[in-house]
């Protein structure tokens, strides 16, 4: 479904992504791991168009989407959440998701229908599926950090994505919230059959949910394989996991 | 779930205020009726600015251009063309909207302050043309004694026309603010980057906002011609843009009716303080300073907060 080939991006001479290669098949859950500064977030920015690549290809369903604008990529079916909470803080939880749905249904240039009457059921369905339905009338900026991260995902679901990209979905979450987020990701990939690509520092979470793992270091892809093979890969252990860690896990 | 109830109290308020304005000429001297018309059309202008400023988060620094273009378009059509009178009233806002489109097309490529700076320079260009082109626009003299349709020049015709058109325009803008477009626009104000990521073509929406705001500013311009029967280049000078910007801030730029209130305060201040001193801007400066320190949300914003309507989060439009 998604294929990244020899992707490169440098900022003012700093090679953020030097040679990234990645493959995600339909229905799969793929994790990207790597130390801080390995280029994971930049890779996601490249895929979703926030940053355009210097060279390389990004194929989505056989089509090269490298360099397209973010809104175009979103309309092709790739949606994302952000590492740092990135929501519409002055709007209610309901409105946050509703706007995404309006965008998906191309209603955003409609100037005459009252918005409060639109897409109520669809919006509540999404909020229900992530467990935020009771908080739908709250101003999103007043939610707890964990809820805001979940709302991130809910907004991304508004565009009915085929590929959902989550940038550190549990960053800054408490252990309970992390467990809930893990449950949510399981539901999204199981029940809704979403393809999920995510990066994460919580190794326990990564190895419990990812079907394949891609390891990045200094902007390069070291390996992409199944969790077991990644665990046993010496290169990975030396580069990132400091040896030993995974054999204990 | 959003509030689905029809607010009866609100309807009574709107009807009461409407009735008050309708009966105003019966018990107010002519000058005050004129002043009210001026407040209404200035309020309309400020509200149209707030559409992009408060709801769209765009730094619309030279909004008066669209007002001036509307006024001049009507004035020129009435004095220089043989077209039926009412076509001018329809064409003028459309011309403003077109100018909004052209200026917007260039400006939305930039963001925030740069957007505003570019707009000031493009707007000043339009002003300079009008100011200098004596043979066509009358230059710095402007155009005076514009022949208006009879219905507008008799008794309180201009006032009622202004009142009706302002009410309709406000209603339409209110609908727009609460439409999917309006909601998207507010989302863009809060977080343009995220909007792009959920498939919204931010620039296109900003451009659409610019056209809509230009259109309504153009309507305000035609109303000015109706009330004053004259136009002059000051209508599109940048100081006027600043004034209406202050009206939005003063009334509360995160509320829908705030700019209307701000316009009322400013017009009244200018008129009455202006009688005693020509340094009325001095008073304005003091008002502004007090505003920034004590009422950052504007008058209406503060009233709403005090009344418990505000949710404690700035900019959650409820009125």
Feature locations, PLM:
Chain A
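Glycine-rich phosphate-binding loops of nucleotide-dependent enzymes
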Residues: 1-249
């Amino acid at each position: 479904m998604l294929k990244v080939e020899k992707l490169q991006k440098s900022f003012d001479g700093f090679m953020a992504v030097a040679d990234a290669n990645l493959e995600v098949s339909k229905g799969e859950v793929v994790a990207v791991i790597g130390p801080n500064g390995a280029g994971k977030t930049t890779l996601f920015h490249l895929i979703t168009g926030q940053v355009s690549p210097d060279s390389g290809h990004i194929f989505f369903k056989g089509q090269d989407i490298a360099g397209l604008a973010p809104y175009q990529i979103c309309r092709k079916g790739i949606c994302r959440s952000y590492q740092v909470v990135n929501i519409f803080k002055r709007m209610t939880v309901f409105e946050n998701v509703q706007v995404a749905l309006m965008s998906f249904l191309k209603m955003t240039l409609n100037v005459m229908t009252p918005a409060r009457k639109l897409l109520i059921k669809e919006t509540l369905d999404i909020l229900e599926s992530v467990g935020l339905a009771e908080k739908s009338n709250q101003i999103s900026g007043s939610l707890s950090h964990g809820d805001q991260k979940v709302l991130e995902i809910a907004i991304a679901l508004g565009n009915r994505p085929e590929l959902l990209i989550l940038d550190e979905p549990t960053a800054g979450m408490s252990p309970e919230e992390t467990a809930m987020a893990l449950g949510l990701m399981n539901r999204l990939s199981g029940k809704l059959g979403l393809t999920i690509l995510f990066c994460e520092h919580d190794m326990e979470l990564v190895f419990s949910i990812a079907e394949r793992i891609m390891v990045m270091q200094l902007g390069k892809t070291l390996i992409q394989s199944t969790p077991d093979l990644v665990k046993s890969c010496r290169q990975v252990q030396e580069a990132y996991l400091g040896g030993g860690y995974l054999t204990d896990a | 779930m959003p509030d689905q109830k029809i607010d009866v109290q609100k309807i009574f308020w709107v009807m009461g205020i409407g009735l008050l304005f309708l009966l105003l000429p019966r018990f107010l001297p002519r000058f005050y009726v004129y002043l009210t018309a001026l407040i209404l059309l200035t309020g309309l202008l400020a509200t149209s600015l707030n559409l992009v400023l408060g709801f769209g988060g765009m730094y619309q620094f030279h909004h008066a251009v669209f007002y001036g273009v509307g006024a001049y378009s009507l004035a020129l059509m009435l004095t220089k063309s043989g077209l039926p009178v009412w076509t001018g009233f329809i064409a003028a806002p459309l011309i403003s909207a077109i100018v909004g489109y052209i200026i917007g097309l260039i400006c939305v490529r930039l963001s925030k302050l740069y957007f505003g700076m570019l707009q000031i320079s493009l707007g000043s260009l339009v002003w300079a043309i009008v100011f200098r082109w004596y043979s066509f626009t009358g230059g710095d003299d402007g155009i005076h004694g514009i022949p208006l349709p009879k219905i507008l020049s008799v008794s309180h015709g201009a006032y009622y026309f202004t009142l009706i058109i302002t009410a309709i325009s406000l209603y339409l803008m209110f609908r727009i603010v609460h439409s999917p477009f309006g909601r998207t626009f507010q989302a863009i104000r809060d977080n343009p980057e995220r909007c792009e990521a959920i498939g919204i073509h931010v620039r296109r929406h900003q451009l659409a906002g610019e056209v809509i705001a230009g259109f309504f500013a153009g309507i305000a311009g035609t109303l000015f011609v109706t009330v004053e029967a004259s136009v002059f280049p000051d209508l599109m000078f940048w100081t006027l843009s600043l004034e209406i910007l202050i009206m939005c801030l003063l009334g509360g730029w995160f509320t829908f009716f705030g700019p209307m209130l701000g316009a009322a305060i400013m017009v009244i201040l200018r008129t009455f303080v202006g009688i005693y001193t020509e340094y009325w801007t001095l008073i304005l400066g003091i008002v502004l300073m007090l505003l920034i320190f004590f009422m950052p949300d504007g008058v209406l914003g503060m009233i709403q907060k005090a009344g418990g309507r505000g949710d404690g989060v700035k900019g959650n439009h409820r009125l």
